[in-house]
Amino acid sequence: KTVSLVNFKKILRKYNLKNNIYIGGYYPINSEINCLDVLEILEKNNFKISLPITKKNNKMDFYKWSFKDSLGVNHQGIPEPNTKKKIIPDVLIVPLIGFDRNKFRLGYGGGFYDRYISKVLKLKKILTVGFAFSFQEISKIPINKFDQKLNFILTDKEIIE
């Protein structure tokens, strides 16, 4: 089970985002919802796809990737692009293990996404969409000053905006 492609496209339409833009995705691990099916369909509809490459200092950047390309494996055992064309996505799909109605997320604690979103928002406006299962909702996520609020949370049942 995954999020609705129809609902994701509603979000894109709301911001008048058409194909030929970069969508930043992720390779799902553990309990993260799988976004690869959505990304594959988007790529077939002429959206450009990118995936993160993480570094040992808890930083990451996004790199152009296509389903025709191979993937390497990083120091944590997570598949990553072999390509080295760094880009800044226009829309960033964010993984999570928990979320609340205020659109804050709980990750694995490394701060990769919070740091990346904070850095990129200084350079350009991006749309952030957390992908989640509805059962991952928590009444209130404990937040600190580094936590980044998402624009949307898209679950298998609804859009939270």
Regions found by a protein language model. Give the residues of each.
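Short glycine-rich anion-binding loops that position phosphate/pyrophosphate groups of nucleotides
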Residues: 29-31, 97-101
